[in-house]
């Protein structure tokens, strides 16, 4: 367990050895952050910055080409089956039609299906649960979009072959609760902001 102040480069301090270990041993390392925002920061800033520095220093990492995957809970991904069924409903209110049109423009260009790309406003966030992937509404055996058109499936498949898998505490604990059925098998785990893990575990695994 290591503790350090804000802004001194903790993420770089654990990312570099994690990447090197994963490449040299051909085994995945899972990095768990407290929130999705921190996940996004690692993927969009910290990891690219680190790789850029290594490239400038001409430091070659041992092993094969580095593969990094980000994985979130299923509700972060659009379900094309639910979206398509909704947009075919006649007589939709203008707010819903506008939201579905925005999604139409997006689904033709997105490779991830991750709602983070959309920067949804409050009203759109209220509508999102009607189109997101949902365990209760997942019918893989009768879905025309599964597996090739299922963004959740594709994200999990990408994680299967990754050296570094970036998740959040909620998903990490969800995987634990489901006996490891979400994440690929791993033996090395880095927990960023570990002091938040107990609270999340209480929310995820506790009951009244």
How would you describe each model-predicted region?
Residues 10-11:
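Conserved lysine of the Walker
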Residues 19-20, 76:
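Residue-level marker of positions within ordered structural domains that often coincide
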Residues 4, 14, 20, 37-48, ...:
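Signature of the SF2 helicase/ATPase Hel1-core->accessory helical subdomain module
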Residues 1-3, 30:
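Short hydrophobic/aromatic beta-strand immediately N-terminal to the Walker A/P-loop
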């Amino acid at each position: 367990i290591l503790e350090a102040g804000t802004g001194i480069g903790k993420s770089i301090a654990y990312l570099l050895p994690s990447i090197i270990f994963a490449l040299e041993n051909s085994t995945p390392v899972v990095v768990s952050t407290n929130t999705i925002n921190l996940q996004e920061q690692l993927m969009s800033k910290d990891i690219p910055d680190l790789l850029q520095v290594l490239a400038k220093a001409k430091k070659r990492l041992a092993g094969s080409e580095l593969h990094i995957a980000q994985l979130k809970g299923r509700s972060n991904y659009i379900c094309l089956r639910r979206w398509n069924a909704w947009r075919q409903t006649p007589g939709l209110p203008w707010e819903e039609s506008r939201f579905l049109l925005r999604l139409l423009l997006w689904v033709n260009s997105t490779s991830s299906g991750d709602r983070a790309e959309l920067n949804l406003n409050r009203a759109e966030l209220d509508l999102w649960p009607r189109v997101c992937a949902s365990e209760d509404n997942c019918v893989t055996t009768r879905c025309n979009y599964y597996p090739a058109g299922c963004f959740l499936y594709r994200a999990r498949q990408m994680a299967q072959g990754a050296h570094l898998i970036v998740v959040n505490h909620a998903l990490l604990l969800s995987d634990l609760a489901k006996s490891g059925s979400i994440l690929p098998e791993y033996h090395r785990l880095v927990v960023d902001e570990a002091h938040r893990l107990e609270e999340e575990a209480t929310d995820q695994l506790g009951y009244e």
